Amino acid sequence: MHQYHKLQVEAIYCGTVIDHIPAQVGIKLLSWFKLTATDERITIGLNLPSNKQGKKDLIKIENVLLTEEQANQLAIYAPYATVNRIANYNVVCKRTLTLPESIANVFICPNSNCVSRSEPVASGFIIKTRGKQIHLKCKYCEKVFERRAVESSNLK
């Protein structure tokens, strides 16, 4: 296995680095979790070489610090990602993610009859795991969906 010592994406002075995102998931995280809702510079590395994963994605957001809750929501799609807080070009806090119990205002319920699709209410799901599978239970219609079904209903 090759050791990669070259910096693939430019370092940032201050902000957040989301590392070890599964390849092909980085852009989805930017969209679903509204990580681009800032005027700060965002650097994205896609399909970067990784000793552990083979390939990975990477997101760097300057001058933006994610809360623990925001970071943990990413675990739904990037369970082994790390969220690093950067100050003066150094990692000052490295956080591994924990799957949250619930998630709100991120995804739309796939059930076309769900009240959350027709009424001005915030969407919300309770997160359940079955083995390694992640399922989301809508807090309104109480239907349980595989993660992929919720993902598909949110593609534009």
UniProtKB/Swiss-Prot annotation:
Q: How is the cofactor bound?
A: Binds 1 zinc ion per subunit.
> What's a single GO MF annotation on this record?
metal ion binding
- Could you give one GO CC term from the UniProt record? aspartate carbamoyltransferase complex
Needed cofactors: Zn(2+)
GO-annotated biological processes: 'de novo' pyrimidine nucleobase biosynthetic process; pyrimidine nucleotide biosynthetic process
**Do the record's keywords include Electron transport?**
no
Record keywords, A-Z: Metal-binding, Pyrimidine biosynthesis, Zinc
The domain of life for this entry's organism is Bacteria
UniProt-annotated binding residues for Zn(2+):
C109, C114, C138, C141
Q: What does this protein do?
A: Involved in allosteric regulation of aspartate carbamoyltransferase.
Under the subunit heading, UniProt states: Contains catalytic and regulatory chains.
The family this protein is said to belong to: Belongs to the PyrI family.
HAMAP family with a match to the protein in the record: Asp_carb_tr_reg (MF_00002)
Q: What is this protein called?
A: Aspartate carbamoyltransferase regulatory chain
Give the organism the record lists: Baumannia cicadellinicola subsp. Homalodisca coagulata
